[in-house]
């Protein structure tokens, strides 16, 4: 199984995944049989890439122990001193490492390639922070960042020889883990984590894992900066959360082109490959299952036709039966899966399987380079996304293809 996810030019279709029985609690409530069944069903449906998340608070369960006057005294693994082992020095729970290794074994058996979101401290509207770091700035505090670097270096060093792993991801939307950062502080954090990954494994691409970055001076998480640091950029183009997008029916032209337009803007302005790492309708509050299937058919096909690398759905499984946070906080997190609670397929998965079969049937791996008719120059002091998106849509209506600078 090749792990060259962004080099052979073949478009991939994938999903973000939490185990169907437990969601974000899967590492604590580990069930190998469920994980195996999840991956078997995904492989049967022609899903070839899965983004997975070693939850930060489970894998690095550090706790600060305090002395008199609430003086910080010692970081431990729960109540136990840090062992004098490689894992102990990184603050890693070795039981979780064994479970992640089993996950890699299962992925290899089913020919599924993994994107690993390393610093997953934010997920679906809830923070998952090691107790030792509660109340600290998770992207600026030197104590926190030093332990993040140890965590990343250990995980990458330990798993870099696993065939199933195709790419490393900084983590899930790490720009949601702090606020008030300067552009320079964002640059420094992203560089530190990327350099920690590459110090252990220079053979695999590193992906941003971010959402809502822009190539504008006003964006502190700046996609041009991330293009300097990282190998691959990504978009998380949910219409509900993206300015100027939640205006039309989800199966209309404007919505269908949103993910492509945003990804083309990132790739062309940053000079790095881009793919759609999280796509979704956010469930029945936005559209019916049938209309969601129509949306995916148009959006994923558009991404392929424009030379993007892949389309990854959020997410594999419905989570409407789960009662822990964030699922009992957020109605939009509960009914997003390919599979219903009873295991039956939704139209979204049928649409993606159909596109996978279509691409498999072609006698070439990659489309020729996209021909563009014009360049839209995004200048300083403007709403770059409004202008890029509007220009992209208007150009399509006029029969033109544009890129951005």
Give the ranges of each region predicted by the language model.
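Short, flexible/disordered intra-domain loops and linkers
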Residues: 28, 65-71, 179-184, 217-218, ...
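Short, solvent-exposed loop/turn elements at domain surfaces
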Residues: 20-27, 243-244, 383-385
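Active-site mouth of glycoside hydrolases
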Residues: 2-230
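Carbohydrate-binding surfaces of carbohydrate-active enzymes
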Residues: 269-270, 280-285, 290-405
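Charged helix-capping and loop-helix junction motifs
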Residues: 97-99, 255-259, 290-298
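Glycoside hydrolase catalytic-domain groove-lining segments
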Residues: 183-188, 192-195, 199-285, 318, ...
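Mobile, glycine- and charge-enriched loop segments
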Residues: 1-18, 266-293
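Beta-sheet entry/capping signal
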Residues: 49, 113, 166, 205, ...
């Amino acid at each position: 199984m090749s792990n060259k996810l962004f080099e052979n030019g073949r478009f991939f279709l994938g999903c973000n995944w939490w185990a169907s029985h437990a969601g974000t609690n899967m590492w604590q409530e580990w069930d190998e049989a469920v994980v195996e069944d999840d991956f078997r069903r995904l492989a049967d449906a022609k899903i070839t890439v899965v983004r997975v998340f070693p939850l930060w608070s489970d894998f690095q369960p550090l706790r600060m122990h305090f002395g008199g006057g609430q003086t910080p005294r010692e970081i431990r693994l729960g109540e136990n001193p840090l062992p004098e082992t490689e894992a102990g020095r990184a603050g890693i729970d070795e039981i979780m490492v064994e479970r992640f290794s089993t996950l890699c074994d299962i992925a290899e058996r089913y020919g599924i390639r993994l994107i690993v979101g390393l610093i997953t401290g934010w997920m679906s509207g809830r923070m998952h922070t090691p107790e030792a770091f509660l109340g600290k700035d998770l992207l600026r505090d030197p104590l926190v960042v030093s332990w993040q670097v140890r965590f990343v270096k250990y995980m990458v060093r330990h798993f870099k020889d696993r065939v199933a792993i195709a790419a490393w991801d900084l983590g899930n939307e790490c720009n949601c883990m702090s606020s008030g950062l300067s552009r320079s502080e964002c640059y420094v954090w992203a560089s530190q984590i990327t350099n920690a990954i590459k110090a252990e494994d220079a053979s695999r691409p590193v992906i941003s894992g971010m959402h809502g970055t822009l190539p504008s001076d006003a964006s502190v998480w700046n996609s041009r900066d991330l293009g300097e640091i990282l190998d691959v950029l990504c978009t998380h183009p949910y219409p509900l959360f993206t300015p100027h997008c939640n205006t039309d029916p989800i199966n209309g032209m404007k919505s269908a082109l949103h993910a492509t337009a945003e990804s083309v803007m990132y790739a062309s302005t940053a000079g790095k490959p881009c793919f759609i790492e999280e796509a979704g309708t956010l469930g029945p509050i936005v559209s019916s299952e049938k209309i969601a299937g129509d949306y995916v058919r148009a959006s994923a096909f558009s991404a392929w036709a424009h030379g993007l690398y892949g389309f990854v759905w959020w997410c594999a499984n419905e989570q409407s039966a789960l009662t822990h946070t964030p699922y009992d906080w957020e109605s939009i997190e509960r009914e997003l899966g390919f599979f219903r609670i009873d295991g039956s397929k939704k139209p979204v998965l049928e649409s993606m399987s159909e596109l996978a079969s279509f691409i498999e049937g072609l006698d070439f791996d990659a489309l020729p380079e996209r021909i563009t008719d014009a360049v839209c120059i995004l200048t300083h002091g403007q709403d770059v996304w409004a202008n890029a998106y509007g220009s992209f849509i208007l150009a399509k209506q006029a029969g033109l293809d544009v890129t951005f600078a």
